[in-house]
From Swiss-Prot:
<dbReference type="GO" id="GO:0051382">
    <property type="term" value="P:kinetochore assembly"/>
</dbReference>
<dbReference type="Pfam" id="PF10384">
    <property type="entry name" value="Scm3"/>
</dbReference>
<dbReference type="GO" id="GO:0007059">
    <property type="term" value="P:chromosome segregation"/>
</dbReference>
<dbReference type="GO" id="GO:0005634">
    <property type="term" value="C:nucleus"/>
</dbReference>
<feature type="compositionally biased region" description="Basic and acidic residues">
    <location>
        <begin position="23"/>
        <end position="40"/>
    </location>
</feature>
<dbReference type="InterPro" id="IPR018465">
    <property type="entry name" value="Scm3/HJURP"/>
</dbReference>
<keyword id="KW-0539">Nucleus</keyword>
<dbReference type="GO" id="GO:0005737">
    <property type="term" value="C:cytoplasm"/>
</dbReference>
<protein>
    <recommendedName>
        <fullName>Protein SCM3</fullName>
    </recommendedName>
</protein>
<dbReference type="GO" id="GO:0097030">
    <property type="term" value="F:CENP-A containing nucleosome binding"/>
</dbReference>
<feature type="compositionally biased region" description="Basic residues">
    <location>
        <begin position="1"/>
        <end position="14"/>
    </location>
</feature>
<dbReference type="GO" id="GO:0071459">
    <property type="term" value="P:protein localization to chromosome, centromeric region"/>
</dbReference>
<feature type="region of interest" description="Disordered">
    <location>
        <begin position="1"/>
        <end position="48"/>
    </location>
</feature>
<feature type="region of interest" description="Disordered">
    <location>
        <begin position="168"/>
        <end position="202"/>
    </location>
</feature>
<dbReference type="GO" id="GO:0000086">
    <property type="term" value="P:G2/M transition of mitotic cell cycle"/>
</dbReference>
<comment type="subunit">
    <text>Interacts with YTA7.</text>
</comment>
<dbReference type="GO" id="GO:2000059">
    <property type="term" value="P:negative regulation of ubiquitin-dependent protein catabolic process"/>
</dbReference>
Length: 223
């Protein structure tokens, strides 16, 4: 009797287990079919990121926009709102090389001019202002205006980079040669400023020498 009861319990458990498996399979199939039907009725739309175009500012448009073409040269507006000729990358690099060569020549002239500074220098006591060893260097600075030496004066790089002659470009009073006149005017303004600064420096040096002479005279009287 006991064995029959055990066998019947096992059979009932197996039947229950099989029924549960069947229910799970049916529920899974139903859910899959519902998902497929829903996807067929409502297709999923792909979301693409918005294509944001970079808008050029008016300043950029003004730089790249050609103003006019004169004598084979296309003129554009620079960042500083000056009319300048448009050059290719190779032309710009060539003119940059010329400007670098100009700078190298100026510096080599400066070095050659002052390379013997130790021999012609004066020894000055910074506390008292007294010239301990007088080699005439300070006196020559006041007597000679060294800034007028054009070999050691660097000119504007604008002409070196652009390098278009006035004859090739047309009349100097032409609208499209304002960059050349502006550069010449700026150079003259710089020269005028340099002259005023040189006059101020000379006055300061003269005042310092007067003070120094007064100190020396006092010391001589004391001694």
């Amino acid at each position: 009797m006991k064995t029959n009861k055990k066998i019947s319990k096992r059979r009932s458990l197996k039947n229950l287990h099989g029924a549960l498996k069947g229910l799970l399979k049916e529920s899974g199939k139903k859910s899959e079919s519902k998902i497929r039907k829903h996807s067929d009725c409502n297709p999923v739309h792909r979301v693409y990121p918005p294509n944001i175009e970079k808008r050029k500012t008016k300043k950029d448009d003004g730089i790249s926009r050609p103003i006019a073409e004169r004598n084979g040269h296309v003129y554009i507006m620079s960042k500083e709102n000056h009319i300048i000729p448009k050059l290719t990358d190779d032309e710009v690099m060539e003119r940059h090389k010329l400007a670098d060569e100009n700078m190298r020549k100026v510096w080599s002239n400066i070095i050659s001019k002052y390379e013997s500074i130790e021999e012609q220098g004066d020894l000055v006591d910074l506390k008292t202002g007294e010239i301990v060893e007088d080699n005439g260097h300070i006196k020559t600075l006041t007597a000679n205006n060294s800034t007028k030496d054009k070999r050691t004066k660097y000119t504007s790089v604008l002409r070196d980079i652009i390098d278009i002659s006035d004859e090739e470009d047309g009349d100097k009073n032409d609208e499209y040669t304002l960059w050349a006149n502006d550069s010449e005017a700026s150079d003259s303004e710089v020269d005028a400023d340099n002259d005023t600064e040189e006059e101020k420096d000379e006055k300061l040096i003269d005042a310092d020498f007067k003070k120094y002479e007064a100190k020396l005279s006092k010391r001589i009287l004391r001694d």
